[in-house]
Swiss-Prot record:
Subcellular location: Cytoplasm
Protein name: S-adenosylmethionine:tRNA ribosyltransferase-isomerase
Similarity annotation: Belongs to the QueA family.
GO cellular component, one term: cytoplasm
Pathway: tRNA modification; tRNA-queuosine biosynthesis
Main location: cytoplasm
EC number: 2.4.99.17
């Protein structure tokens, strides 16, 4: 499918640089194919769903995955570099996107330290060896530390990995450490936030409980590949980077019971949706899942496990806009995004939200 079909004009001013405050004050656009668009608020979500429905949250926790350091090579001078960790392959190995990747080669040693430091003492530094250099700036790093010791070093020396469209406009600050983390995050490992979840405050979660809506947690450690642009002209030529997900047997049983009684499984974010679809059989039965998924969803995909989706507003030509177009229909989403832009909705990670229903979904009294 041609990538330019997913292009649209997005004013730069529409990209939010800060989230709404409080976090549940964001706007919510309800999109049901065939029905008028409805301008609501995130706080309306409990009233827009039915008792017995299940909201599925991704409980991954963002780690400070952006590391700055100095490359050292025998007979050469030091070279500043940056690595954005995106996939852990072993207790001491991470795949990362490096800058400048062309200046790195297998065998190079890198001393990572505090942001912008040119000299780092042995006690505060983190050493790694470049084992591979791949395409698109990707490298494989083998660290001298392993397991929890490596986790502790990354937590102490790394910086929060804000998305490029935000980080390019302003520096990361202390407020981002709270803003760019869901209130229910508990499983460290993501290098990008599951941003649809950023809208949920403790008060909103309490309202969801009071409305009789189930809350279910799964884990997908979001990788930096979510920030990568689609450079191919056709979706068939684009390769998704793998991400690690976990959905246990008890969770699978709960979700299957929700659908068996006629209620809906509502994914909070594209990351939760991708994990659910990766775990589902062709008949929609959700199975336990533990491992990597590189599922790439474009129009024509038949959804198996998800009945509605809460998600932010995504960038043009992105894999995420392709996914929502597959879910609700390309024409529907192009019209919804045109309305959102004209109505001043805020886009991207810190922006507003939408509640999407799939093509062919029956009209619900709670939405009309």
């Amino acid at each position: 499918m041609r990538v330019d079909l997913f292009d649209f004009e997005l004013p730069e001013a529409a990209i939010a640089l800060r989230p709404a405050s409080p976090r549940d004050a964001s706007r919510l656009l309800v999109v049901r194919p065939g029905d008028p668009l409805a301008d609501r608020g995130v706080r309306d979500l409990p009233a827009l769903l039915s008792p017995g429905d299940a909201l599925v949250f991704n409980d991954t926790r963002v780690i400070p995955a952006r590391l700055s350091g100095i490359r050292h090579r025998a007979g050469g001078s030091g070279q500043r570099c940056e690595a954005m960790l995106h996939l852990r392959e072993a207790p001491d190995r991470w795949r990362a996107f490096a800058r400048p990747a062309k200046r790195l080669a297998p065998g190079d040693r890198i001393r990572f330290g505090s942001e912008g430091a040119s000299e780092v003492c042995a006690l505060s530094g983190l050493d790694a060896t470049v084992e591979e250099r791949g395409e698109g700036g990707e490298i494989l790093l083998r660290f001298d530390l392993s397991g929890p010791a490596l986790d502790e070093a990354i937590a102490g020396l790394g910086a929060l990995p804000l998305p490029p469209y935000i980080a390019g406009k302003r520096p990361t600050d202390a407020q981002d450490t709270t803003d760019y983390q869901t209130v229910y995050a508990r499983e460290p490992g993501a290098v990008a936030a599951p941003t649809a979840g950023l809208h949920f405050s403790d008060a909103l979660l309490a309202g969801i409980d009071a409305a009789g809506i189930e809350r279910v947690h799964v884990t997908l450690h979001v990788g930096a590949g979510t920030f990568l642009p689609v450079k191919a002209d056709d979706t068939e030529a684009h390769r998704m980077h793998a991400e690690i997900g976990i959905l246990d047997a008890a969770t699978a049983a709960r979700l299957n019971a929700v659908r068996a009684r006629g209620n809906r499984v509502v994914a909070v974010g594209t990351t939760a949706l991708r994990l659910l679809e990766s775990a589902a059989d062709p008949d929609g039965t959700i199975r336990p899942f533990s491992g990597a998924t590189d599922i790439f969803i474009t129009p024509g995909y038949r959804f198996r496990a998800v009945d509605a989706l809460v998600t932010n507003f995504h960038l043009p030509r992105s894999t995420l806009f392709m996914l929502v177009s597959a879910f609700a229909g390309l024409d529907t989403m192009r019209a919804a995004y045109a309305h959102a832009i004209q109505s001043g909705y805020r886009f991207y990670s810190y922006g507003d939200a939408s509640l999407l229903f799939p093509e062919g979904a029956p009209v619900s009294e709670s939405i009309t």
